[in-house]
Amino acid sequence: MALKIRLARGGSKKRPYYHVVLADARSPRDGRFLENLGSWNPMLAKDDEKRVQLNAERIKHWLDNGAQPTDRVLRFLNEAGVAKREAKNNPIKAKPGKRAQERAAEKAQKAADAAAAAADAAE
């Protein structure tokens, strides 16, 4: 049984409230869970201490027993100092696309041609 530490949505329409729960990965998002581990209220201010509440002791216990947190929960755990979130590394994303590289090469070529023409005119 693969266990996930994830968010289960509660609250009413347009007023979300989430429970941080331990659940089987195959169970529905708001369905059966094994243990309630905390809560997240995105409607509160970001600096409010009640915005994210976690039971760090139980979360550590379940992480040691193989439970996998979802990305959003891992962000909360990283902020609380319970778990370490590795920085994502995508070096390809930093490179411009093919057409942008072509445009940059054309622009550089035009600048070089203009500089050469200016040098010829100065002589």
Curated annotation (Swiss-Prot):
The organism's place on the tree of life at top rank: Bacteria
Database matches in SUPFAM superfamilies: Ribosomal protein S16
Entries under Pfam families matching the protein: Ribosomal_S16
One GO MF term: structural constituent of ribosome
Biased composition (Low complexity): 111-123
Keywords, sorted A to Z: Ribonucleoprotein, Ribosomal protein
Spans annotated as Disordered: 87-123
Biased composition (Basic and acidic residues): 99-110
One GO CC annotation: cytoplasm
Biological processes per GO annotation: translation
Similarity comment text for this entry: Belongs to the bacterial ribosomal protein bS16 family.
HAMAP family tied to this protein: Ribosomal_bS16
Protein name per the record: Small ribosomal subunit protein bS16
Gene: rpsP
